[in-house]
Structure formats: C-alpha cells, structure tokens
Amino acid sequence: MENKYNLTREQNVFVAKRNIVNYIWNSATLEGIKVTYPETQAIYDGGIVNGLTVDNIIAINNLKYAWQFILETEDIECDYKLLCHIHKLVADKLVLDTDLGKIRTTPVNIGGTSFKPQFPIESQIKEELVEILNQEEKTKTEIAIESMLYIMRRQMFIDGNKRVAMLFANKIMIDNGCGIITIAKEYQEEFYTKLIKYYESGNMLELKNFIYTYCIDGINL
C-alpha cells in the first residue's frame, strides 16, 4: 500500500487548514449529528446555531480544538499518551471528567451489531499500539489506517472512539505528508457496513482498502 501523496508537513497542513470545516463536518455526520455544512461553518466561526443540541455544538467545537492541536503540534510522538490527550480534547464536557483520557471501566454497546468489545487493558493496548506503529515494512499511510481501525474496534474509551481514532491517524498522515483521512458523506453508509463487518470478523483488509481508495484527501504537486 503506497503513500498516495508525498507532501511536506507544511504542505499537508495547508491542505488540512483549507478544508478543515469539511473534515469536521464529515466527522460530525459520521457520528450521526444532523448538522449542515453551513451550520458547521457557523459553529467553527463562533456563531450561534439554532436547532442543534448543546452536546452536538460542543462535539463540533471539540473537533475544531482537536484539529487545531493536531495541526499546530509537530514534535509530539504518536503514542498512547497522545491518544489519551486527543480523547481529552474530543470528549471534553461530553463525558465525566474522571473518564477524560482514561481507559473505560464499563461495558459499551455498538449499534447495529452484537459485537461486544473486550474490556481494555492499558498495558496490552500500549503494546499492541507500539506493534502497529513500528511496522517498518509498511508505509505511513497503511500504518495510519491500521492504527485508526484498531482504535475503533478496541473501543478503549467510554465515548468518542471513532473521532479519536481518525484524529490520531491524521496526526500520522499529516506529520509524514500523506494527506488526510476523511469519510465523505457519500461514502459513510458503505463505510459503516464494512466497519460492522470488521468489528464482527476482526479482519480489516476490506475496510482498509476501501479507506485507501475512497477516503484519503490531498493534492498532487
């Protein structure tokens, strides 16, 4: 799986900033938040939007702050510590303070499937994450996608796992000039179908190829 884009970090940040509202909108709709692009733009700009719940507005603002962190911090290693920090940004004011950036201690259910994620063990997650991130034979794009899907299926946090997973993966992508992973609205239904299949089987190959083919944004220079 080759890198689709070969940008400098500066170029990749430029692409991300130019399309940031669209990426936030895609993430919000992926989570089932019924928000329009203009509403997302208004929230991003600090405006008032009627018709959305307070939690939905908080979720969108949290995505904004998390993206800003990803784009503005270059010299931070992609590891378990960063993963937990991203969760603090994504889930702020949406979960109990005691759950922010912490491994969940209660069961979670996933809609659309009978799959039950096992309880996360911190030492095991750290070890598994290191193994994924240090695959020298694979490109950074493939490592980013695999880490994202691993985090999604592991469901290590009480809430916000997909958002955390995608932001973590995009930190890898951007730092290495590989573009941006984003699930556009027209691909979300198929993405979810393949995601459920992956949850139940544990085999990520089909979903990984789908994301690589349809869900990486960037520019060719």
For the regions a protein language model found, what residue spans apply to each?
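FIC/Doc superfamily catalytic core
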Residues: 1-221
